[in-house]
Structure formats: C-alpha cells, structure tokens
Swiss-Prot record:
Transmembrane segments: none annotated. Pfam families: Viral_DNA_bp (PF00747). GO terms for cellular component: host cell nucleus; viral tegument. One of its GO terms (molecular function) is single-stranded DNA binding. HAMAP family: HSV_DNBI. Plays several crucial roles in viral infection. Participates in the opening of the viral DNA origin to initiate replication by interacting with the origin-binding protein. May disrupt loops, hairpins and other secondary structures present on ssDNA to reduce and eliminate pausing of viral DNA polymerase at specific sites during elongation. Promotes viral DNA recombination by performing strand-transfer, characterized by the ability to transfer a DNA strand from a linear duplex to a complementary single-stranded DNA circle. Can also catalyze the renaturation of complementary single strands. This is Major DNA-binding protein. Keywords: DNA replication, DNA-binding, Host nucleus, Virion, Virion tegument. Gene3D superfamilies: Viral ssDNA binding protein, head domain. It is found in: Virion tegument; Host nucleus. The gene is DBP. Homooligomers. Forms double-helical filaments necessary for the formation of replication compartments within the host nucleus. Interacts with the origin-binding protein. Interacts with the helicase primase complex; this interaction stimulates primer synthesis activity of the helicase-primase complex. Interacts with the DNA polymerase. Interacts with the alkaline exonuclease; this interaction increases its nuclease processivity. GO terms for biological process: bidirectional double-stranded viral DNA replication; DNA replication. Belongs to the herpesviridae major DNA-binding protein family.
Length: 1128
C-alpha cells in the first residue's frame, strides 16, 4: 500500500472546517417535488424518504462533500476536527408526505414489518422521548407548513443523528440557492461540542428519520454481516466511531450461525473465521466510507446533459424516467440472479482434498434457503427458529421465491421496496413453457381485485406489489441452500481505467517500468496506441468510433472497396506494430499468454448512480468483498492460534487487535482492493468558527478557536480490480472443449463470417430486385456458387463481390480465434487486427475469452401486459382492462449484447458483474497472500434473455459450447446522460484532414502509381481551389511524399486547361480518357538481377513493405507471408 501522503496532497487536509451536517429547508411553492420523487424512495403513506445528495436539487452548487467536522471540545478553548465525507443520500423528514411516491402500491409498510418479524430481524425501537418539534430547529420567520425539511449528514456522524445526539442551531442559518429555490440550511453539531452540556429538548431527534435509517441503511449492513440485532449493531458502530475502537472486537457476540456451520466437522474454526471476517469488515468499511473522496462530475445535477433538450418540468421528469429505465437491468439482475450479493448467506469451508487451494478453502456462499433457516449463537444455543415460507422445502425441487424474499432483498425497508418495485416495472416478463398461466388482464380483474389481497384489498390491483410479482414470477430465482463456491454479483460505477479490447492489457508496459521514464529515442508502441491509431485511420476513411459511415456504399463496387480500404488500414497498422515489437526485442509470444481483460469497480460512493438502491448495493458489495479477502488471513491466524474449544468472542478478545493491525498490510493492494493511506493535518493552529455557546442562545458571534485533528490517518479506497484471462492456458478437459477451435471446415462459413451482418444491412442496396433473404442467398451461394444479378447491373461487379466475400470468409474461418460476427466496421477492423496479432504469436488453436457488454435499450410498447400504467384506478373486468390499456404505452427496457466492450467502457458505465476472488501465494518462496478478482458467471435463468443458452446461431453447428468463452457484463453508459462529453481542446482544420487523407492513399498504394487517385481526392476536397495551388501548397499537402508534387501539379494543370467541371467524377472520367485509368501506361520492363550479400541481409533485418521502392521488383510483401516469419 502506498505510504502516507503529505498534507498538500490529499483531499482531507484541503477540506474546510464545518459542522457534522445540515438541515435543509426547501420552499414547497418552487421546489421540484416530482423530480425529487423520481429520484427518491417514497411509497404510499411514507413519513420519511431518502434522496441522493446532488448539487442543484438537494444541496447548493459548489457544496463540498469533504469536511473537517468540529465534533468535540475537550475544554472551552480547544476544538477537535475530524476529516470525513458526507453520506451519499439525504433524508427528507419534514412534510415528506408532500413528495409523491415513486411506487403507488399500498401495504408496503405492513408487509415489511411482518416479514422482518418472520426473518427474525429486530424492528426499530424509538427513543423514550418525543421527536423534536419544528420550533426547535426551524429558523425564525419560516413557516414550517410551507417548507420541506431534509438532513444531509456526514458519514462519521450518521449514528449520532440516528441516536438523537446532534444539536441544530437555527440562529446560524444560511440562505442558499438550490436549483430555482431560495432555500435555507441550519448546521448540526455534536452535543460534545458544548462542554457545559445541552438540554435534551434542544437535541435534534426525529423518530421517522431514525426509523428510515434503521430500515434503509443499517438493516442492509446487518444482513451483510449476518447479524439480526440491528439496533445493537448501530450502538456498536456509534461507539466505534466516537471512541475510536476500530481494533476492538464488537459484533462477534451478535453473530448467528446456520445449521450447516454448527454441524461442520471443523465448526469451531469456521465460526471463528466467519466472526473475524465480520469484525474486520466492521473496522475497515466505515473508515473507507468516511474517507475523503473525489467529487465526480455527475454530482452536478444542474448540468446533467440528460436535461439539455427539456422544456418544462414534465419533460425533465420524463427524462429522469428514461434514465431510471436504463438502470433497471442492474437492479433486476440483483433480484433475479441466484448468486446476487443480496443473497450472500454465510461462510463455508470445503471438505474436499487436493482440488481446492488451501487459501480458497474458506469462501462466501449464497442461498435464500440458508437465510431463512434456524440459527445458533456463538455458544451454540438456538436463537432463531427459522421460517418455513411457501414450499421452502421444495418437495418437487427447489423452493418457490415469494414476495417475502423480495422484501428481504429490500432490507425490509418500505422505502427501498418501493424503489425496487419501481425498477421492476420496467422489466419484461418471461413466461415459462411448462406452466401455462392466465393473462395479465384476467389476473388484474380477478384475483388482484379480490378483497383477499393482503396488500391492496382489491382497491388498487393495477399497481399492487402482488400483481407485479405475478407478472414476473417466472424470472425470480429458486430458493436453495447451497454450499458451492460460486461468484457473487456486484453493482456500481466502473473505474476510469478499463482494458476491455480483445487482447485486454497486452503490452501496456504499466507494470514493467523499472527505471522511471524511458529515453525519448525509445518510444513504446503499446497495444492501446495501436487501437487508437487504428481508430484514427478509420476516421480518415469516414468511419467514426461507433462504426458509422459518412458515406454509405451504393453498389457492389463500393461495398468491396469499403472493406478493402479497411483491410489495408488494418494491415498497415499490424505491420508497423509487429515491426516495433521485433525492433524492441519484446517477447510478445510469451506476453500474450498472460494478458487479461481488466475492469475496475469504483470505491467512491459519490461515483455511484444517483439512487438509494445503488447506495445499498455499494455498501453490500464493499462489505462482502472485504470479508472475502480477509478469509485466508483469518484462517492462517486461526491455524497458528487454534481456538481449542473457545467461542468466537473469547478467541477474538485475545487475538483481534493483532489481526486488525496486520490486515491493512496483508489485504490492501494485493491484487483486488487498492487504497491509499493519507495523513490529514490542519494547516493553521486556529480557525474562524462561530461562537457556538452564544449561537445556542440566539446570539451570533465569531471567534478564533484553537483546533487540532482527532484522527490523523485516513484510508482512502480507490478501486476493486476484476480480471478475465484472454488466452486459454488451462488443462481442464471440459473447459478445453469450450475453447478449442475445430479444424473441420464448416459449410456455413459465409453466414458465420465477417461480412454477413453487412451483407444483410445492405441487402436491398446490393440486390434491389431479389425476394430472397440475405441469409438464404449467401447460404445458397456457399453450396451452389451462384448469386442473382439485378437487371441492368454489371455481372462482373457481382462476380467480384461474390469472390471477395467467398475468399475473405474462407481466410477468416481459417485464422479466426475471436468468436464474434462483427456488427460494425470498427469491430470488423479490430477482429482482423487481433487475429493477425494472435497468429503472429502462435495462438491459433484455441478461441480467446471475450467480455460482451449487455447495454440497456429503452422502448415503448403497448401496455397490455403492464398494468401499472393504469395507476390506482379500479378494474371491473378483463374486457374493461383491455379497453383501458388499449390506448396506453409502457416504457420497458431490454439489453443488447455488444461484441466489444471497450467502446462502452469509455463512456464511464454503471456495471453489474459476477466476481470470484481467488487467493494464492507468491512465487520463489514469497509466502505473502495475494488475491485475484476474476470475472465469473450469472446464475439463474431469469436474469436476462441474452444469458439463456441457445443451441446455435443461424445455421451454425458447433461442438463446444460458447458460453464458457464468453463472459457478460451489464453496462449502462453515463457519458451524455449524467456526465458531459469532453469537447476537443483544439479543432481540426480541414487542410489537416486533406493532408492525412492524401498520405493514407499514397501509403496504401505503394505498389502502383497513385497520382491518379491523389488528384481525384484533391479535386473532391478542394474543387476550383486546385487551379491556384502553388508548389509550396502541394508539397505541404503531400507531406513526406512531397516528391510527387510536380506530377500532381502537372495533372491539375491538364485538368484546368481542359475546362471541365471541378468535380471528382468529371476529373476521374477525363483522366481515364487521357490515361486509360490508373496504372494503364504499358511500359516495357526488363528483369535486373541485383546481387545482395549475406552480410547486408543480416544487418538490414526484416523489411516489411517499405515506401517508395520503385517498380515491381521489390513489391510489398503480403501480411500473410510476413507475420509467420517474424522471429524475436
């Protein structure tokens, strides 16, 4: 881990002193309540809700998320500051009922309370005092009925807010502009700031707010730690924060263990390791969350590009709904996936011998069945009797998922449950072929409208949670109790550094710099540069980064030329790249075997999407990963210090301090979680602060107070790294069958080849008269060798097209090890590029592993199967339902698979992915434990239709399954939605594009006289300006090929004297009439034998396609000839 930084380097030292939080008051008359509702967690009858902290909607622009909070005064003349960041969400508690609910289904609060009880989690117990009255915290002159009240609280002091130990000081009010509303904020200080004490009536407490925190925040933490006494957990967290007890074991007495742990042959060690992992997560996770964080651009709500074209509040709310729809697949995946992080149920230990590494013998398990089993306390006494649930025993297999399991996933919080239900409304149902069910309309008008419904009693069947559950019932996962070691699915924001091109981090040189900066005369040609250069070449051909063409092909000649131009650009880049590797003596054949796709999961809470659900998922993901990476450390320490019959709390009393102290150096920066340790200082011995004692009495004075930091070291998390090996190197026979490439030639080589999607896209352009589909036409050609020719078209052109497609497809099938059918020209070019590199590296036997992105696409569909569009209106019959929904539409979301994830990763996506953390030791006697976060697989058939196993694509027959060599990641780009796209610092002049285009033409046509094409390109770009070109102009435009300037000027002069129109078509026709086309001059060549000495050959090295070498005696070698001959 990186050493402590100086005070000038970290955000904590740069933050300013301030309070522990603020109470914000927004005027109801001007505040955008519907936008807040779309961002929040309101439900029918809510008294408090959570909303993301965003500049411009909940806090003022320029709000600092990092602060040095004044939280204590040991004596009247000294203050203690603590560096912390704000909590990701704010809590709306005053007049919260004025915010519309995000989900209108009734009965959520009662359902959550009942389900919490049957799962054994304790409910919120209010303090034995009344909630603070508005007069205690409202500034003078404000009417409490005209304002909405919300609390923004810091991470380090949210437990103090929960327990009513903060003091609001209305006399220190500040007027701030939040969006279009003139709002007011009042600071909150800890009661320890007042040495003489504060009357309890002056301490701010709101039972509805604390209940919301108990349900929406702390119950989720308790679930991640597998403890059921939530209130006691909050007390321990407050004590740890207040008294700095991070190295003291706290939660072990609260732990509960299922029967599988109690009955395990090594149950004593398993209980100790489980408890120790939870203790480490409790010690380190709060420290990481309250550390200072970078302020991302997405925090500025008032500058979201999402609202760029919105006129009026209705359009803004509609834009927010569309944005929320794009996030729905991430939320639904966590509900529908069997291995969701929400269903992680405990720690298991393998009993097998030899197969599992010792460090992987302890692992995290998941299973809804385990979560509802009976449990025992650390002293092996029964403490929770369990819950049977509906068919949980699974008489005919796994148990059935029930509404109660959905409530469990939402942490028994009606606020979170409403938000989950809102996202699930965007999802499409998948009807099982085995269980025929009634139509949605029949259900809504029948069972849902019955008074027997426990939630809505038949009054609001269209929006009832039971109706939503019925519509999606076949997508929910089975209820099982598993002890397998499977990945778990995490969700959050992607980091800024991802390497997801086909070859991942191949030749990135990041970890190989031993002596700092390299000399300028030895530049590194990295794989990243290669991809950037390729994109630049394609842009010169009129192809943008997404594969879109500036000029579409209009016939077979244009179609063939389009691909030949792309092929030439790719081949030129590959030759240059391979030459560079050979020149620098890079052992690329070995390096390609160890390359990975790399993805980063950001640990910045404010980089997460603006949604309380993602705050919950981020907390759960971080706590689970911390426990996972701590398991081998706890196991080794328990092996060295066996429990010998001690209970986990007893064992931890004697060993936890040492274990906690060593965890930082043993687990951080060891392959998965990266963090930095920062030293926080305050530059001045004193600071200007209000006189809080006087302010409490209503008098506002300033004073200069001596201060010091109460906590100096801060652990700032950065990223969690997830990898995926590109080249298969394993020995497992089953896996090998999935990756091995068949040597038999396939009959359908064209429809599985690189051109098929383009042939389908331009089918009507190429064959305007045919009624045959493109699939049948080209499949038929591969068997019968015939293509139709439209009337009036050139048979030669279509013959050339067919031969080009046939030859290119055959060559592609022979060399291809990237199992995708490219859908755009960028993917086509990258596939050709990487196939050439892999062939040069000798990797032709196995397909490589791929990461495909599942990118959401919103769509508007008829509302027949989406009853929630009707709202709370009553439904009398199925016919009335059909009539009511016939004219309505519903917004739904589906995911489309992308062939290459790299372009999506550049757009700062929100990602949902499965991860497995493997542990291993170093090499050459290094006994340190390292971790590797490996990309895994989703479990559950209802996650997404793209993940369902298909028997084949088109007419393709494949022996090995492709699922093992294709990993999937849900990815929602945020660039252009919540983050502005970067504008180019410098604009490109037109003359630069002309020059680059001419150089590209000459570079690609070194074997033939290219003056003809250069002149036509010049005329097309400059028109009549060509007549006035000087020699200096021509030499500049031709760049390093300026020797052609005279020939180009002579040809332009010939065109000018002819008097023809200055267009590319007219110039081409004229020159073809004069010269007979490019290369038509019939010169008489003789063969000249040129002796070359062996010594000169050895010194010259490998020459690949040099420029300006004269006539055909030294033609540029073909790529297929060059690459196999490369030797390092």
């Amino acid at each position: 881990m990186q050493g402590a930084q100086t005070s000038e380097d970290n955000l904590g030292s740069q933050s300013q002193p301030g309070p522990c939080g603020y109470i914000y008051f927004y005027p109801l008359a001007t505040y955008p309540l519907r936008e807040v509702a779309t961002l929040g967690t309101g439900y029918a009858g809510h008294r408090c809700l959570t909303v993301p902290l965003l500049c411009g909607i909940t806090v003022e622009p320029g709000f600092s998320i990092n602060v040095k909070a004044l939280h204590r005064r040991p004596d009247p003349n000294c203050g203690l500051l603590r560096a912390t960041s704000y909590h990701r969400d704010i809590y709306v508690f005053h007049n919260a009922h004025m915010v519309p609910p995000i989900f209108e289904g009734p009965g959520l609060e009662a359902l959550c309370g009942e389900t919490r009880e049957v799962f054994g989690y304790d409910a919120y117990s209010a303090l034995p005092r009344e909630s603070s009255k508005p007069g205690d915290f409202f500034p003078e002159g404000l009417d409490p009925s005209a304002y909405l009240g919300a609390v923004a609280i810091t991470e380090a002091f949210k437990e103090r807010l929960y327990s009513g130990n903060l003091v609001a000081i209305p006399s220190l009010k500040q007027e701030v502009a939040v969006g279009q509303s003139a709002s007011v904020r009042v600071p909150l200080y800890d009661k320890e700031v007042f040495p003489e004490g504060v009357p309890q009536l002056r301490q701010f407490y709101n039972s509805d707010l604390s209940r919301c925190m108990h349900e929406a925040l702390y119950t989720g933490l308790a679930q991640a730690l597998r403890v059921r006494r939530v209130g006691k957990l909050v007390e321990l967290l407050e004590k740890q924060s207040l008294q700095d007890q991070a190295k003291v074991a706290k939660v072990a007495p609260l732990k509960e263990f299922p029967a599988s742990t109690i009955s395990h042959p090594d149950s004593g060690a398993l209980m100790i390791v489980d408890s120790a992992a939870c203790e480490l997560a409790v010690s380190y996770a709060p420290a990481m969350l309250e550390a200072s964080h970078e302020t991302p651009a997405s925090l500025n709500y008032d500058s979201w590009p999402l609202f760029a074209d919105c006129e009026g509040p209705e359009a803004r709310v509609a834009a927010l709904h569309r944005y929320n729809a794009s996030l729905a697949p991430h939320v639904s995946t966590q509900i529908f996936a069997t291995n969701s992080v929400l269903y992680v149920s405990g720690v298991s230990k393998s009993t097998g011998q030899g197969k599992e590494s010792l460090f992987n013998s302890f692992y995290m398990t998941h299973g809804l069945g385990t979560l509802q089993e009976g449990t025992w306390d650390p002293c092996r006494r029964p403490c929770f009797s369990g819950w049977g649930g509906p068919d949980v025993t699974g008489t005919n297999g796994p148990g059935n998922y029930a509404v109660e399991h959905l409530v469990y996933a939402a942490s028994f919080s009606p606020n979170l449950l409403a938000r989950y239900a809102y996202y699930l409304q965007f999802c499409q149902g998948q009807k099982s072929s085995l269980t025929p069910v009634p139509e949605t309309g029949s259900y809504v008008a029948g069972a849902a409208a019955s008074p027997m419904c426990s939630l809505c009693e038949g009054r609001a069947p269209a929006v009832c949670l039971n109706t939503l559950f019925f519509r999606l019932r076949d997508r929910f996962p089975p209820v099982m109790s598993t002890q397998r070691r499977d990945p778990y699915v995490i969700s959050g924001a992607s980091g800024s550094y991802n390497e997801t091109d086909f070859l991942g981090n191949f030749l990135n040189f990041i970890d190989k710099e031993d002596d700092g900066q390299r000399p300028d005369d030895e530049p590194r040609y990295t794989y990243w540069q290669l991809n950037q250069n390729l994109l630049e070449r394609l842009s010169r051909l009129g192809i943008d980064a997404e594969g879109k063409l500036e000029k579409e092909p209009h016939g077979p000649r244009d179609f063939v030329k389009m691909f030949k131009d792309v092929d030439a650009a790719v081949d030129a880049e590959v030759v240059q790249f391979m030459n560079s590797m050979a020149k620098n003596n890079i052992t690329y054949k070995d390096l390609v075997k160890s390359c990975y796709h790399v993805m980063q999961y950001s640990c910045n809470p404010f980089a997460q999407p603006a949604c309380p659900i993602f705050t919950q998922l981020f907390y759960r993901s971080l706590l689970t990963i911390l426990q996972d990476i701590s398991l081998p450390i706890c196991m080794c320490y328990e092996n060295d210090n066996p429990g010998l019959g001690q209970s986990p709390p007893e064992w931890l009393k004697g060993h936890y301090q040492t274990l906690c102290t060593n965890f930082r150096s043993l687990a951080i920066d060891k392959g998965v979680l990266t963090a930095k340790e920062a030293k926080v200082v305050h530059g001045e011995p004193t600071c200007d602060l209000p006189d809080l004692d006087a302010a409490l009495q209503g008098r506002v004075y300033g004073r200069r107070l001596p201060v010091r930091m109460s906590k100096v070291l801060m652990l700032c998390p950065r990223n969690i790294k997830i990898k995926n090996r590109v080249v298969f190197t394993g020995e497992n026979a089953a896996l090998q069958n999935s990756f091995i490439k068949s040597t038999t030639r396939r009959e359908n080589y064209i429809i599985n080849g690189p051109y098929m999607k383009f042939l389908n896209t331009y089918h009507k352009t190429l064959f305007p008269d045919t009624k045959l589909s493109s699939l049948y036409l080209w499949h038929n050609f591969s068997r019968r060798r015939s293509v139709p020719v439209p009337s009036g078209a050139s048979a030669e052109e279509y013959s050339d097209l067919a031969l080009f497609v046939d030859g290119g497809s055959r060559a592609h099938e022979e060399s291809n090890v990237i199992d995708v059918v490219p859908g755009n020209l960028v993917t086509y070019a990258k596939q050709r590029l990487n196939n050439a590199i892999l062939k040069a590296c000798g990797q032709t036997q196995f397909y490589i592993s791929l990461i495909q992105g599942l990118v959401p696409r919103t769509q508007s569909v008829p509302a027949r199967d989406y009853p929630h569009v009707l709202g709370t209106r009553a439904v009398e019959s199925a016919a009335a339902y059909a009539e009511a929904t016939s004219s309505l539409t519903a917004t739904t979301v589906v995911c489309a698979a992308t062939d290459c994830l790299s372009q999506v990763c550049k757009a700062r996506p929100v990602v949902t992915l499965p991860v497995t953390i493997n542990k291993y030791t170093g090499v050459n006697g290094n006994n340190q434990i390292f971790q590797a976060g490996n990309l895994g697989y989703f479990m559950g058939r209802g996650v997404d239709r793209n993940l369902l196993q298909a028997p084949g694509a088109g007419l393709r027959k494949q022996a090995g399954g492709s699922s093992m060599r294709k990993k999937f990641v849900f990815a929602t780009p945020t660039l252009g939605l919540t983050v502005k796209r970067r504008t180019q610092a410098a604009t490109t002049y037109e003359i630069e594009n002309i020059r680059a285009g001419l150089e590209a033409i000459i570079s690609q046509k070194q074997e033939e006289d290219c003056v003809f094409d250069v002149v036509c390109n010049l005329v097309d770009a400059m028109g009549e300006a060509c007549a006035s070109l000087t020699r200096d102009d021509a030499e500049y435009l031709l760049g390093r090929f300026s020797v052609l300037a005279d020939s180009v000027l002579e040809t332009l002069a010939t065109i000018a004297s002819s008097g023809i129109e200055w267009t590319a078509e007219a110039a081409r026709d004229f020159l073809e009439g004069v010269w007979g086309g490019p290369g038509a001059a019939q010169d008489n060549f003789i063969s000249v034998a040129e002796p070359v000495s062996t010594a000169s050959q050895a010194s010259a090295g490998l020459l690949l396609g040099g420029g300006g070498q004269g006539s055909g005696g030294r033609r540029k070698r073909r790529l297929a000839t060059v690459l196999p001959g490369l030797e390092v």
